[in-house]
Amino acid sequence: MIAECIKKVASHSDLSVYEAKGAMQDIMSGNATDGQIGAFLTALVMKGETSSEIAAFASVMRENAVQITPKRNGMLVDTCGTGGDGKNTFNISTAAAFTAAGAGVTVVKHGNRGATSKCGSADVLEALGIKIDISPERVCEIIDENGIGFMFAQSHHPAMKYAGKVRKEIGIRSFFNLIGPLSNPAGADAQLLGVYDSPLTEKIAEVLNILGTKRAMVVHGDGYDEITTTGITQVSEVNDGQVRSYSLDPSSFGFQKADAASLFGGDSQYNAHIIRSVLSGDEGPRRDIVILNAAAAIYLGERAGSIADGIKYAEKSIDSGLALEKLENLILLSGGKNDS
């Protein structure tokens, strides 16, 4: 299948859902050669991937994942980004995940080690003392008990090994950078998903809609794959089959405009220190951006009727110590080590 698809894509023709799924299954099953994978990825980048193609690729990745089924106490929410924005911030969506969990949202956090940054979510969680390479069954138990757990992508997507070498060798951004965040192994009902380029907000929202995601906010703010406090964020929101796009201004929620330098991160140990400081109540621009992103996750998880209400719940989560408690519990339950 993939050989025929390469020819079609090279002629700048779009793939049908059947063709896209077939090509992706060839990759995920190890039936495609490295040369075929490289040619396919390159041709797709040159043509440009359609929403239906990306959805088809993601659906196959989901089918090949080691999935888990946590108990549903309301919506299951994931907070993640594509990475690749080049901003080198601390791990904002990871801090927001603990804050949302402290507000009563069940968070099924999915992530990996950093590819384009010094520190991915897996790296910073490990630096915080969390054991990340645990069985999927144990992750499911932790989510049920703690209301937040972490699914390490390498443990849940073993078939990705077939594409890993080629992706590194060709060194170009491809649909694989997009479908990881679209392939939550717990079947998240709602997602706060940051993308590295503004035009992707609508396209990825369309993909999530095709995949049946109940609620989502796909965001890109002032160059960040986050809701930002440095400027305006472009949002494409999915809500029960409908997609609407709008701009979000942090000043309308009372946040001061942040300077980009105040959001810089570093290596995993440095970023872990920042997250623990924010969850411990330190104030300033780092707290502000975590609060704003957590508020969106709380809103998507239907624990708040609006982002404005979500901000109040996020602030309470941190100030009450509940967000930090979720972190401490995850360290303990994962069998990790707390060095704080």
UniProtKB/Swiss-Prot annotation:
It is an enzyme of class 2 (transferase). The keyword Metal-binding applies. 5-phospho-alpha-D-ribose 1-diphosphate binds at residues 81, 84-85, 89, 91-94, 109-117, 121. Anthranilate 1 binds at G81, N112. Pathway: Amino-acid biosynthesis; L-tryptophan biosynthesis; L-tryptophan from chorismate: step 2/5. Binds 2 magnesium ions per monomer. InterPro entries: Anthranilate_Pribosyl_Tfrase (IPR005940), Glycosyl_Trfase_fam3 (IPR000312), Glycosyl_Trfase_fam3_N_dom (IPR017459), Glycosyl_Trfase_fam3_N_dom_sf (IPR036320), Nuc_phospho_transferase (IPR035902). Belongs to the anthranilate phosphoribosyltransferase family. Catalyzes the transfer of the phosphoribosyl group of 5-phosphorylribose-1-pyrophosphate (PRPP) to anthranilate to yield N-(5'-phosphoribosyl)-anthranilate (PRA). Homodimer. This is Anthranilate phosphoribosyltransferase. The lineage of its organism: Archaea, Methanobacteriati, Methanobacteriota, Stenosarchaea group, Methanomicrobia. The gene is trpD.
